[in-house]
Structure formats: structure tokens, C-alpha cells
């Protein structure tokens, strides 16, 4: 195994200028990530200088067999923490050969919203809290839980320390460092309320980059859990009963909200979000009704509410924002399996472009 390890960790730059680019895209379910690699003649830092590529869309449920070619458009580059050196990860979106975005390409419409002059002028910032659950591969039962049984009730696990409270920290820390290496703006990690559940935060990131960074961070997490022989689940309620679900709380601010007097603008933005509650819920992730029950730090899926420091509300405003009269707010409705392109762009569209 040592020779295999040595070969995996070969430093290509010592013998060749060529690099490996791992092209990554979202598959037909809207949540499954796919990737494949190609050799390039030398280092690349600008996605516009990367070649387009194609793949068999009939094998990802994105095209029929008789017309299966789907085109990959490179959109964002990150350093590859697995191959290291000058090798890169490339976030792509997907198009037909005629240049039409596929239905699963949520980045295309998000980019249009973020490039709108009224949105771009407000420099929207996002901080996304991505929760996930680590599962034992052979049983699909949370890591650290007894097979067919349950751990002690929730309470000691949130930000917990110790072998009886924190399950999978090696995976979490490996992911944290790999994201920092890659150039993702990951801002922290913590153990969550349900044992075996964790969270990482990305941001503040501007506009479309928030979605690119979340998808890249998810890809890196999937690869690390693959190596560890563990399954990562983004299901919003992986275990029924008296256990917390998994969300992707999305923190948001605009230039106007961050300036003096911004609290009044925040309140107007939240009011607009309330008026479009049903539309947002429909776009905020599959299975969210199992999570948004009014229990376990959520509000009921059919009810919109907001409050200061209230983790049982749809939207939470922090004490500091209220005190300073400016800042940001947190949309607590998105589920852990949400598409970050959809959620971030929809919040911007509703608060900056939509007229009631």
C-alpha cells in the first residue's frame, strides 16, 4: 500500500508542466455531483481560458440516449486539495450543444439575477450554514449510533467534545483544511444538536460565488467521506422523531443594509420575503416539510415569522444588528439539500427586484 500511496501523492510539477483539471457538475437529480478529469498543458487560473468539455447526459438522467451529449462550461476554479500542486477543481454548469441551459442548470438564471445592475450595485453578501449528517456506509445509520438503536437524548452533542459526543471529527477537520487549501471562503465548523450531524459555514461571499463555493465544498466533503468509507447525507430530516433536522441557514446583507439606517431596509426586505413565503418554500429544498414542523428550532412550514434572536422564526435578526441599526439577517428556511444558486439568487430577486 505504501507504493500506491506514493504514486497517488506524486508531485507532477517535478517532471511535467501538465496539470490535471477535475471538471465538476450537478447531475440529473439536482443534488448528485459528478466529475471527471482531463490533462491540460499547463497551469490555468482563469475559467474563461479552460476548454469546454462534454459528457454522456443519458447516464446522468440529463439527456436521452439518442442525443446524449451535454456540454460543460467552466465557471469557477479552485485548487485541488487531493492532487495538490497546480492541479485544479473546476465548477461547471451544463448546456445542450445548441447552448441552451439544461433544466438542472440553476447557475445560469442565478448569474442573470446577480448581473442585474440593481443587484450588482448592492453587492449582496451571503453566509451559508451547511448542515449534514455522517452515516455508516453499510447501514445508513448515523455515525456513532448503535446499530438498530439510539444514543442518549439531544443536549450534550452541540459543539460537544469527547468520544461519546463527537462522531467523525477527523472527517470534519480534514474537510475544513481542504476547503481552506482550495481557496473556498469557509469560515468555521461545529458539531450539531443531533449526534453525527455537523455544520460548516461558507462566507461572506458575494453574489454567484456563494453558490460556486458551496458546491465546491460539498464536492470536497463527498470525496473525503468516500476515502473514509462513510456516507454524507444532506437529507433535511434523516432520522424521524425527537431529533433535529438539517438546514442551510442563509445569512444575507446588501450594501444598504450594512450602512447606517440599514435596519429599516432589513425590515422592508423581510416583509417582502413574507409576501413570497410560498414561492420561497417551494424552492428551498426537497423534503423540507419533514424539517419545518415548528419544533427543533424551526417554524411551521406554512407560517412566516421573524424576530430578533428567535431561532424558532422563519427569519432571525441578530441582537447586534438591532443594536447597531445595520447589518444582516438570517433566512432559516432553506433545507440542507437546497440548491445554493436558487436560494441566494431568489433572496436577491425578492428583496431587490420584485415589486409587491
Swiss-Prot record:
GO molecular function annotation: ATP binding; glutamine synthetase activity
One Pfam family it belongs to: Gln-synt_N
Keywords, comma-separated and alphabetical: ATP-binding, Cytoplasm, Ligase, Nitrogen fixation, Nucleotide-binding
GS catalytic domain ranges (all copies): 106-356
UniProt EC number: 6.3.1.2
Gene3D superfamilies: Glutamine synthetase, N-terminal domain, Glutamine synthetase/guanido kinase, catalytic domain
Reaction catalysis annotation: L-glutamate + NH4(+) + ATP = L-glutamine + ADP + phosphate + H(+)
Compartments in which it is found: Cytoplasm
GO cellular component terms attached to this protein's record: cytoplasm
Record's protein name: Glutamine synthetase nodule isozyme
